[in-house]
């Protein structure tokens, strides 16, 4: 049986390391004010401007397509076209957070 994922803890850890996380997820992104503006790797994006991620709270949006989300896990899920659970596990691995197989006692 798999352990329950602590989405809140994973999101909190991701936000604490968000500059490095964003660098890895969106290489070439540019800091503009409190946001990272990057090309959207999910579409044939040729210009910076419409895909933005808030560096402090993790909210993100692609204003050209209407896609948006509220936290780092949803960003990873969107970019990888994967489920929220898969995204949480991927982000946890990236951050060195153990999510499964914990032994107690």
Each language-model region and where it sits:
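N-terminal structured subdomain of primase-like DNA metabolism proteins
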Residues: 1-105
């Amino acid at each position: 049986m798999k352990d329950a994922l602590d989405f809140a803890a994973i999101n909190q850890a991701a936000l604490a390391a968000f500059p490095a996380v964003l660098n890895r997820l969106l290489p070439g992104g540019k800091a503009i004010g409190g946001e990272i503006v990057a090309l959207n790797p999910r579409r044939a994006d040729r210009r910076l401007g419409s895909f933005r991620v808030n560096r402090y709270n993790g909210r993100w949006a692609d204003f050209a397509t209407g896609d948006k989300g509220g936290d780092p896990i949803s960003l990873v899920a969107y970019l990888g076209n994967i489920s929220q659970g898969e995204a949480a596990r991927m982000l946890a691995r990236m951050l060195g957070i153990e999510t499964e197989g914990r032994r107690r006692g």
